From Swiss-Prot:
Entry GO CC: host cell; host cell nucleus; host extracellular space; virion component
Pfam family, one: VPR
Organism: Simian immunodeficiency virus (isolate CPZ GAB1) (SIV-cpz)
Modifications after synthesis and translation: Phosphorylated on several residues by host. These phosphorylations regulate VPR activity for the nuclear import of the HIV-1 pre-integration complex.
Lineage: Viruses, Riboviria, Pararnavirae, Artverviricota, Revtraviricetes
Protein name from the UniProt record: Protein Vpr
Gene of this entry: vpr
Subcellular location field: Virion; Host nucleus; Host extracellular space
The keyword tRNA-binding is annotated on this UniProt entry: no
Primary location: virion
The entry's keywords: Activator, AIDS, Apoptosis, Cell cycle, Host G2/M cell cycle arrest by virus, Host nucleus, Host-virus interaction, Ion channel, Ion transport, Modulation of host cell cycle by virus, Phosphoprotein, Transcription, Transcription regulation, Transport, Viral penetration into host nucleus, Virion, Virus entry into host cell
């Protein structure tokens, strides 16, 4: 009978510790790109919806990740990541 291999990798950090570190990193990045009152309202909404629970922590992590991804993708002025307008050819030809 087959058995799953034993875990031979390095021990993982606890999920809660990882989640709090990830949330802290996302918050630090978010305050560089979004207005603080807006982020405060987002945090208040999450707290009102989920209370002080791990589900709330997971929700705000997910929302901040999405917001930052979209922000960078649309062309954050602080980042090299983003959609750059295509340059038009000088001879008038245009590829579609």
């Amino acid at each position: 009978m087959e058995q799953a291999p034993e875990d031979q990798g390095p021990p993982r950090e606890p999920y809660q510790e990882w989640a709090l570190e990830t949330l802290e990193e996302l918050k630090n990045e978010a305050v560089r790109h979004f207005p603080r009152p807006w982020l405060h309202q987002l945090g208040q909404f999450i707290y009102d919806t989920y209370g002080d629970t791990w589900v709330g922590v997971e929700a705000i992590i997910r929302i901040l990740q999405h917001l930052l991804f979209i922000h960078f993708r649309l062309g954050c002025q602080h980042s090299r990541i983003g959609i750059l307008p295509q340059r038009r050819r000088s001879n008038g030809s245009n590829r579609s």
